[in-house]
Amino acid sequence: MIGIRGAIASVENSEDSILESSKILFNTLLEKNNLSVTKIVSVIFTVTKDLNTAFPAKAIRDLGYDKISALDTLAPDVDGDLLGCIRILVIYEDQFDPNHVYLGEAKDLRPDR
C-alpha cells in the first residue's frame, strides 16, 4: 500500500472553485499515476481555514466515484502557509514509485516535485 500526495491552490473561496480545483487535482493524480479506481482504498483532503464553502470530497462523488471512501479535514493553521490550499492523500493498494502532484501556486510547497 502507498500514499500519493498532491495539492492545488483554489482560486477563490466558493463552492464552484473548491470543487473544480479538487476535481482537477484528483483527475491529474489519477492520470499521472495511471491509477485504477478499484485499487483506491481511501482519499483524505485537507483545506486551509479560509476555504469554508465546500467539502472537496464532494468533487469525487460528483465525478461518479461514489464507492471511494473520502474524508475532509482542516489543515493546521501554520503561519506563512499557502492560503486557499487543498491537499490530497490517496491511499492506494499497490507498490510503485508514485508521482506526487503539486499544481499552480502549490508547486512552491514541494520544489523537489
Q: Where are the language model's segments positioned?
A:
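Terminal domain-initiation and capping elements
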Residues: 1-113
